[in-house]
């Protein structure tokens, strides 16, 4: 059951889904429902409405996961993330503690955002916006400006890397013109660190990352 997902290569990290069962697709985009994955059952509907109806139809069941099992699994995930991108989790935790729970976040393609959006428990749905899939550099600032304009007097924040921020730096003028209170977290490691790390892990000499 695929709900609101393109099943893109960046979602699967492989070219094909590789399933051997029926595929049920639920999406509001008709192109997703008729793409190369060839769903057996396609439902064009909003995810929240469909999931709510499915939940009403499902028999009552209970998970064998208890609170300690969930906590232990979270600790395993955090340790894996810390191993891949060391030194970021603690900063993300501190930032989360400092922000109001209803803060709407717009993040760019940067290692800080990659870590934060995996370990940051959100209090409200629809409050973290990230350019997943296409991976657009420069998204965070204009996205946050739009979010802050649409939600006046409510907390909004942008997270960007030092390279991605330069793509839409000029939009700071728009934020000033609109008199927005818009904090920007700039993760500055002086390079395209994620690309450098990927090259090194693939045993490729880093090139054009600074």
Cite the ranges covered by each PLM segment.
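Glycine-rich, anion-gripping cofactor-binding loops and their flanking helix/strand elements
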Residues: 1-24, 123-153, 166-169, 201
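A short alpha/beta connector and helix-capping loop motif
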Residues: 39-51, 169-189
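Phosphate/pyrophosphate-binding active-site segments
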Residues: 19-109
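Short glycine-rich anion-binding loops that position phosphate/pyrophosphate groups of nucleotides
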Residues: 5-8, 110-112, 163, 189-190
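DG-centered beta-turn motif at the end of beta-strands
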Residues: 152-174, 187
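Active-site diphosphate/adenylate-binding microenvironment
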Residues: 71-153
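Thiamine diphosphate
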Residues: 177-210
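Short beta-alpha connecting loops at secondary-structure transitions
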Residues: 35-41, 126-130, 167, 196-208
């Amino acid at each position: 059951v695929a709900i609101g997902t393109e099943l893109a290569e960046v979602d699967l990290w492989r070219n094909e889904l590789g399933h051997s069962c029926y595929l049920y697709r639920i999406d509001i985009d008709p192109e997703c429902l008729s793409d190369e994955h060839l769903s057996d059952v396609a439902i064009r509907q909003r995810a929240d409405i469909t999931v709510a109806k499915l939940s009403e139809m499902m028999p009552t069941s209970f998970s064998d996961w208890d609170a300690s099992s969930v906590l232990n699994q979270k600790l395993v995930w955090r340790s894996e993330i810390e191993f891949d991108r060391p030194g970021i989790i603690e900063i993300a935790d501190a930032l989360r503690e400092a922000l109001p729970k209803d803060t709407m976040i717009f993040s760019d393609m940067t290692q800080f955002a990659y870590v934060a959006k995996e370990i940051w428990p959100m209090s409200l749905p629809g409050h973290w916006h990230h350019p997943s899939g296409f991976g657009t550099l420069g998204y965070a600032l204009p996205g946050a400006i739009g979010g802050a304009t649409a939600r006046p007097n409510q907390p909004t924040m942008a997270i960007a890397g030092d390279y991605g921020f330069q793509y839409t730096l000029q939009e700071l003028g728009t934020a000033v013109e609109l008199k927005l209170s818009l904090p920007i977290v700039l993760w500055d490691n002086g390079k395209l660190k994620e690309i450098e790390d990927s090259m090194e892990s693939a045993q490729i000499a880093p090139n054009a990352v600074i």
